[in-house]
Design a protein with these regions (language model features):
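Active-site-proximal loop/turn and secondary-structure-junction residues that shape catalytic pockets
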Residues: 10-12, 35-37, 70-73, 113-115, ...
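Histidine-acidic metal/acid-base catalytic patches
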Residues: 1-5, 13-27, 58, 89, ...
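Catalytic-core regions built around general acid/base machinery
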Residues: 49-59, 132-140, 197, 235-239
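Conserved short-loop catalytic and cofactor-binding motifs
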Residues: 7, 41, 83, 155-158, ...
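Generic enzyme active-site microenvironment
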Residues: 30, 148-149, 182-183, 251
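N-terminal-biased segments
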Residues: 6-17, 46-54
Length: 284
């Protein structure tokens, strides 16, 4: 059975108590997080601080599944610039450690601004990227986590790994057990990708984001009438029922920009959970 998670980028940390109560009532037992949500100083965060956050959620019968926004708060880091690779890997090593202690073992590498290949030809781009992600994969392995590479559409300012197919082919060529494919439904939607092709890459998928373009709210009423999501939902159910997926968690990823109160957050979260179950068949 596919399990449901929701990323806490959707609400303010100050509302954790009420959101946790809601998630329990909805039988949602997982959340994803961004490290900056709880730790303002990634470099110097102590183990006990990380464990405290994990325990707080465990006490409410909720576990961490994954992390995103791995490079949020950094500046000047680009995997294609040799002089910034080592500082970038050092930062990501700490993030992998945080993920490991939280139990958030699926780390989503999106970060379009940190993978700018604009000065490089195709061969140099591939060589540098393969070397960088092999090193990052080894770091992830040492911490018992996986890095999930996310395709980011061109409209987000990305010029490397912009489609699901391209990203899947890169992951396959890299061939590192701790580097997997991140399946992002917002990317599939934005790029108008043929979701029926996803079964070709299903075994590479390490994590899944149920999302809309630009992280718009995952609204039950709206998605119920969206033929693209309905079609993708049917394909998604087939992937899982045929045991083609190697991951068993799908995460709602959205921003709630128009919320003026805690109740607004809670209502949007409830609607997103309903949509995920109705359209994508994610049960709990």
């Amino acid at each position: 059975m596919m399990k449901l998670s929701i990323s806490n980028i959707a609400w303010n940390v100050a509302d954790d108590d009420k959101v946790a109560e809601l998630l329990v009532s909805l039988n949602v037992s997982y959340i994803d997080t961004a490290p900056g949500k709880y730790f303002s100083d990634i470099k110097n965060v102590k183990n006990e601080e990380i464990i405290k956050v994990r325990q707080w959620w465990q006490d409410r019968n909720i576990q961490f599944a994954g992390m995103q926004s791995l490079l949020f708060g950094t500046s000047g880091l680009n995997l294609f610039e040799i002089q910034t690779q080592q500082p970038m890997l050092h930062h990501l090593e700490k993030v992998c450690h945080i993920g490991s202690l939280l139990g958030a073992t699926r780390l989503v590498f999106g970060s379009p601004k940190n993978r700018d290949r604009s000065k490089l030809d195709d061969n140099s781009t591939k060589d540098i990227a393969l070397d960088f992600f092999n090193k990052l994969g080894n770091i992830a392995k040492s911490e018992g986590v996986i890095i999930c590479l996310e395709a980011n559409p061109v409209c987000y300012g990305t010029n490397f790994l912009t489609t699901t197919k391209e990203t899947a082919e890169f992951v396959k060529e890299l061939n590192h057990k701790n580097i997997r494919l991140q399946l992002d439904m917002g990317t599939v939607y934005t790029n108008h990708e043929d979701f029926s092709d996803i079964d070709k890459y299903a075994e590479l998928i390490g994590h899944i984001h149920l999302s809309e373009s630009n992280l718009a709210k995952f609204n039950s009423e709206q998605l119920s009438n969206d033929q693209f999501h309905i079609k993708c939902g049917e394909e998604f159910k087939n992937l899982f029922s045929n045991s083609l997926l190697k991951t068993d968690i799908a995460t709602i990823e959205m921003l709630i920009k128009d919320a003026s109160s805690t109740d607004d957050y809670l209502q949007s979260i409830s609607s997103a959970v309903e949509a995920s179950r109705k359209i994508y068949g994610v049960e709990n």
